[in-house]
Amino acid sequence: MPGSGGPVATFSVWDYVVFAGLILVAAGIGLFQSFRGRKEASSDEFLLGGRQMTAVPVALSLTASFMSGITVIGTPAEAYLYGTPFWLFFISYAIMSTISAEIFVPLFYRLNITSTYEYLEMRYNKLIRVIGTSMYIIQTALYTGMVIFAPALALNQITGLDLWGVLVATGAVCIIYCTLGGLKAVIWTDVFQMIIMLGGFVAVIARGAVLQGGLGRVWNDSFYGGRLETFSFDPDPLRRHSFWTIVVGGSLMWASMYSINQSQVQRYISCRTMTHAKLSLYVNMVGLWVTVSLAMMSGLTMYSIYKDCDPFTNKDVGATDQLLPYLVMDILADFPGLPGLFVAAAYSGTLSTVSSSINALVAVTVEDFMKPAWPSLTERQLSWINMGMSVFYGAVCIGMAGVASMMGNILQAALSIFGMISGPLLGLYMLGMFFRCANSTGGLAGLASGLAITLWVGIGAQLYPPLPEKTLRLPLSVEGCVALNTSETTTMTPFSTVLQTTTPQPRPALADNWYSLSYLYFSPVGIVVTMIIALIVSAISGGCKQKKVRPELFISKSDLICFRCKKSDSEVSDLIETKPKDNQGLDSPVFYDNEIVLKEKDQQEKITKL
């Protein structure tokens, strides 16, 4: 009986058929895009889809890229263990989307760049660009290893498949369609995988609601179990999740993911116009809302079923990240094929993120290292290099899964990585975009300081996790279990057993204050430290006396919504009809706004009539 504890069924033949079929479709998209685009085998076509993508598929790809297997597995467990404060990320997603669309999109389109780190060389120097690219490569490789490992560990329990077999298979499929199809294959595969992910959540919620007597019962159980206490205005920065940590810290953390992260920027600059790029971010925002809502409802459904018999406390699972897969086999085993659909959903999330990461890693490596070192490379040579680098980074990410196995809660660990590394990088970009007095000396000093601080607190938090009173895990019960399960049901390779280590360690003085800082504040701390140190060093080293910097490298008033809305009609008309003197990247047919073309055409017709 579901919810009573004990071992659950494993995959049936039909589950394997559904799972394998969906994964083969994903790989087939890569092959299709490869054959379809053979005549357009340029580096730009491979890395940016020829800059001809439209808003909706790019938006779904943006959503799928970070709504990975970690989201499919980790977010429901978050709702089950901690309740619904995670829903406050709705506000963070809205703030992040506005910042990315209205500040960063105009800047990157104006500069007509492929790698976001090209901006660092334009604004500072070559050394800072190389450092920024290297930080991104390390961050993405580690994060991608975690994305591969965490769902593989969970799927290992319910399918019985060998852990390393799942890891290698994941990397192999991603390598195939990244190598052959490039960005178009990644985007269209993401669209397909996004549909599968949402379908998996819907299946869990629907079946759970039927078993519990409706969604009203699920909601009622969650209310009395304390899972619906969403709003906490406690200003304590050590509180894991509160209104302030999520809205302030979460907004800046997600902004660092979407505004400067190559795997995301690469998608929206592949759009055919700036309007499509901005629209893709706002549609993506809605996609994030829907995905997180379904994931949270899955977690609340899981709590309603297991409120009297927690599988983790009952030792039916070896890690909290295995809770949702356990639930799937507990409630969907009587419906052949549906467990396979869910596993495909988790696996699709992993494939989506891994493929996005590999494609972005190839882009920054080629643009920031290969092209500057060998500027005479032909398009054909670059295409072969792109494919070779896809294979290389796929292998690296599989290897990094071993490092990822040493992390704890996968959702928190994944977001912590972005806060530690992307936070200081976002501070460096904001410094360059808003402060004309900032120079390369100050930028380098600020970046080094910000990174040192975030690594210090992040690694410290990993070694000495916050005490339970700060994390506020909600109570669970095993009173309704048929019997306590004393056996370990999970089969793991030896290195993954570190997840079960609970040996107490002596805690240093900083463990209960500095190291207990909410992981969502890692990014704001990195931004603030980077900008303050950079401005001080820039002032000392003559930043205000430097030669005039290119004006297109800064954010102008016209880039911001608040100023744009105040413009009179005549000012807007003048702005549209006047083509920038230095073109600012708009002379490319990809970026040339249709309105400019129409205005110039109308002006010519008026002159002809006169």
Curated annotation (Swiss-Prot):
Segments in the Extracellular topological domain: 1-10, 74-87, 156-162, 217-240, 306-340, 412-414, 462-519
Residues with attached carbohydrate: 220, 485
Main location: membrane
A Gene Ontology biological process term: sodium ion transport
GO molecular function: monocarboxylate:sodium symporter activity; organic acid:sodium symporter activity; secondary active monocarboxylate transmembrane transporter activity
Catalytic activity: (S)-lactate(out) + 2 Na(+)(out) = (S)-lactate(in) + 2 Na(+)(in); propanoate(out) + 2 Na(+)(out) = propanoate(in) + 2 Na(+)(in); pyruvate(out) + 2 Na(+)(out) = pyruvate(in) + 2 Na(+)(in); acetate(out) + 2 Na(+)(out) = acetate(in) + 2 Na(+)(in)
Compartments in which it is found: Apical cell membrane
Cellular component, GO, one term: apical plasma membrane
Entry protein name: Sodium-coupled monocarboxylate transporter 1
Provenance organism: Danio rerio
Taxonomic lineage: Eukaryota, Metazoa, Chordata, Craniata, Vertebrata
